[in-house]
Design a protein with these regions (language model features):
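A short C-terminal boundary segment appended to hydrolase-like catalytic domains
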Residues: 202-274
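Extended active-site neighborhood of metal-dependent phosphoesterases/phosphodiesterases
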Residues: 1-101, 125-134, 138-152, 160-215, ...
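Short, well-ordered beta-to-alpha junction loops that form the rim of enzyme active sites
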Residues: 59-60, 109-113, 156-158, 240-242
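Hydrophobic "anchor" residues on beta-strands that sit immediately upstream
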Residues: 107, 152-153
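A short hydrophobic beta-strand element
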Residues: 108-110, 176, 235-239
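Gram-negative outer-membrane beta-barrel proteins
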Residues: 66, 116-120, 245
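Short acidic, glycine-rich surface-loop motifs adjacent to enzyme active sites
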Residues: 97-119
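Residues that line or immediately flank small-molecule/substrate-binding pockets and catalytic motifs
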Residues: 157, 179, 232
Length: 274
């Protein structure tokens, strides 16, 4: 794994709370009254390996908008003070997946969302975050070179839940925004006087000209969490609103990806006796 730039000012708090590998277990002042120790991930971008899933975590820097993982040379805006080291890492991680013939689910996780919903009326809540097309171009370029594409992309940042399906070539890829895990206030996707936002809704403004993007579902009312299930043949992502409590665990939204075909399918639940 490529080492992070630990001198970057934007990383100091994150490193102190999440990147403490090699240190004894300890709580940081940021934990407040929580009985939780600092995490031990190796850096601000990383590969997390598990039997049926490989997660590539990217660091999209500390701007409110946009998310940035490179200098974005030759594009507007560009960021000459940001290293391209994450592109080196991402290319190497994807090529390793190809070389090792990893057959499980490949997830890319990045804080800033590549997509956020666009209302056809043009009326949106003023605090709504923007999509990050240039960041997605960087990810796409690395995937194209390696010949490896993610089965899903997970993000946060926007304080609500949104799910999109991107169709490109024969691949159907869920893009999930889960930014309503507890940070208040929840951000509404429509402003005062806007018509009801109904899904599914095509999002032509999010297309790069080679794909199609559909806004599938959302929750801008509740806090919630994701449950991600992977097995040798499928990846299932569930959204659960916190208002359901501990006794109701049927998801309000879900999507399943066939790992071999990259198509959205009906989930084949494992037998209770298996």
């Amino acid at each position: 794994m490529v080492a992070p730039n630990t001198n970057a000012d934007t990383l100091s708090a994150f490193l102190a709370n999440f990147c403490t590998a090699g240190q004894p277990p300890h709580r940081t002042p940021d934990a407040g009254e929580l009985s939780r120790t600092a995490q031990i991930q190796p850096g601000v971008y990383f590969t997390l390996e598990a039997p049926f899933v490989r997660i590539l975590g990217l660091y999209s820097n500390a701007l409110e908008d946009p998310g940035v993982i490179s200098q974005q040379n030759g594009k507007r805006p560009s960021y000459p003070n940001i290293s391209n080291v994450q592109l080196t890492f991402l290319n190497a991680a994807l090529k390793r997946i190809k070389k090792e013939k990893f057959a499980g689910a490949v997830l890319i996780a990045v804080h800033h969302p590549p997509y956020v919903a666009a209302h056809p009326s043009g009326k949106t809540a003023p605090q709504k975050h923007n999509a990050n097309a240039l960041m997605l171009e960087d990810i796409d370029s690395a995937c194209e070179v390696a010949g490896v594409w993610p089965h899903a992309i997970l993000s946060g940042h926007a304080h609500n839940y949104q799910r999109f399906t991107r169709t490109q070539d024969s691949r159907q890829t869920p893009f999930v925004v889960l930014g309503n895990g507890g940070h208040a206030p929840i951000q509404r996707l429509t402003g005062k006087g806007s018509p009801t936002l109904r899904t599914p809704m095509p999002q032509p403004s999010l297309s790069n000209g080679k794909d199609s993007v559909v806004f599938e579902n959302y929750d801008d009312q509740d806090f919630g969490y994701l449950r991600v299930i992977a097995d040798p043949s499928q990846l299932r992502i569930e959204y659960h609103p916190a208002t359901d409590g501990a006794s109701a665990k049927t998801p309000d939204d879900f999507v399943t990806v066939d790992l071999e075909t990259y198509s959205l399918v009906h989930y084949q639940a494992a037998s209770a006796t298996a």
